Amino acid sequence: MNGVLNSMRLHSSAWITALFAFALFAVVSFTNHILFRTYALDLGLYTNALYDYAHFRFADTSLFLPESKNLLADHFDLYLMLFSPLSWIFKSYTLLVVQCLAVIIGGFGIYFLLNENERTRPYRIWGMAMFYLFFGTLAALAYDYHSNVISAMAIPFFFLMVNRMAWGKAFALLVFMCFGKENVSLFLFFVSLGLFWKYFKVKESRKYILLFAVFSLLYFLFMVKWVMPTIAGEKDFVHFGKYPVLGGDMTAAIKFMIMHPFEFIRLLFVNHMPEDPTYNNEKVFFYLVLFVAGGWALFARPWYFLMILPIIIQKELTNQP
């Protein structure tokens, strides 16, 4: 308790910023929920799953699929089990409350990360406030819940622990983030590669970050090649069907990217669904918005581009835009 009070006294401006941010998030998120403007997939589905987990039952896919399977076969998300006891208190608002609080905590991660360096320390509050007011942050909270958001809010703390060479804490955060959803571990593989690039000249950092990359990749492969197909009773990871342009399964996707690298790059910029001309210029607009929203900084810190590469690929090549 004394530690919290000391933190509030030493970093009072950060706590005040976080308080105002939470009020804003609550107005956006809770108001939409009150007015029935929140989304059934995933918020409604996962709220139902919370109820099942809170009553010691496995959740299933019967709400959105004709064939009922364990919900973990769709996304291996362990956060819902962790948060399920809170549903006894917050009811249908549980995941919205958790998501808003997670973003607030993520803002503190940015604050303390900027506080580490004398050059960036004067901008710590500005960085925190910009994160809270960023349109992507507000959009994530507006009408839905995704466990990816919870995982992403641990990223600044992960960066902080890597910067401090606190490898045990960094690994604990890595494992926590992997528990959010199976595809988060693939993202963390690229995050680790980006950090490997950034800290390449530091031998100790290089060694541990490479281990983090290996762990993330093995976790991803273990989940999508064995655990989830086994739970689903399928031969392969079901969500690869959303990427027919890559071949429809992991092996075909990897082969396509290796054998046709220029075509793969081209598809990231053009409409890969020519039967629907609605999307003809959407990818170009996306990159323009990304550039204006801060993507220009990737030219100065290119390792961050490596980190977000799987997110761009997942967004641009799906047949469910």
Regions found by a protein language model. Give the residues of each.
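Start-transfer (signal-anchor) and selected internal transmembrane alpha helices
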Residues: 1-27, 115, 121, 203-214
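Hydrophobic, aromatic-rich transmembrane alpha-helices
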Residues: 2, 264, 271-308, 312
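Transmembrane-helix signature of polytopic, membrane-embedded enzymes
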Residues: 15, 104-136, 152-153, 169-172
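Extracytosolic helix-loop segments that constitute the early lumenal/periplasmic catalytic or substrate-binding loops
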Residues: 27-30, 46-71, 78-79
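Loop-to-helix entry region of an early transmembrane alpha helix in multi-pass inner-membrane enzymes
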Residues: 81, 89-108, 125-128, 277-281
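Membrane-interface transmembrane helices that cradle and orient dolichyl/undecaprenyl
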Residues: 116-118, 150, 155-169, 196-203
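Short acidic/glycine- and proline-prone juxtamembrane loop motifs at membrane-interface regions
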Residues: 139-150
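Transmembrane-embedded, aromatic-rich helix segments that form part
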Residues: 169-198, 209-213, 306-307
